[in-house]
Amino acid sequence: MGGFIANPAFQFDNHSIVELTHQSRFAGMVNSDYVGFRKEIRKNVPVHFSILYEGIGKIPDTRSMLLDWGADGVFGTQDSGEGNGIIDEGERLNVDSIKYFSQHIFGLHGAFNKAWHQWQVGIGTKLLLHFIDDHHAIGIGLDLGFFRHFNGFNFGFVLRNIPSSGILWENGTIEGTLPNIDLGFNVPINMINYGLEFNPILSIRVNPYNRSLDSDIGFGTMSIDTVIGMECKYDNNLAVRIGRNPLGTMVGGIGISWKRISMDYGFLSEDSNSGLGNHHLITLGFSPDWLVEKVSR
């Protein structure tokens, strides 16, 4: 169900599955959780909800560490170097002045889609609550997704943050996010005699306003980044996945699924130059009816 965040136009065969996901990043410094489920707001009008949380604890606040007393080592004399915010000769840091704070982000995503001609069209709405130290903010956003099966392959694209998204802080500051476009291609290759299915995937992200040094292709302010991946499924129960994210880092995963329960594990290797540790993601999907049946025995 997390696919509805990627493209609200996606449709899945089994709509009764609840998904629970936990992700640990940077060797456990950042932890994220996800819950996804389907709810009919009225007959034959399902909305796919996603609840997300991300927390970062013990973020050091070093702003008061510097003993910025200047060359004479005495506060209040206004000598050379005092109060300039730079560690000058004779000054030092006071480790006892380190303070710690945390960051918490809560998100709610709702996706709704309908058939339109030969396309599946979906709308995704986003609500974000952001808390960092004693500051807080609220954000909203809108995505528009399209998906279609062609002869032998699948194609989808998403217009993100249209017309734009924004986060409003309690002091009136607004963080704006300009629109971008994601395109995805998938060509299923079936080897029925062997029970195998291969799913090569190509995703292209076009951002007209946010070119960076890490961009695969850049034109002026525009950046184009690519994601490639391959999924191999055996007997529709066992899946092995490998790919490359927009930063060029290799990712991989394995999944096991049955009719009413599934388990997945994802892994993102550490950038050899960062020293920040690996990322791990674990997902459990289950049917609520199956869970009630097991508990009531």
Where are these regions (language model features)?
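Subset of outer-membrane beta-barrel
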Residues: 1-297
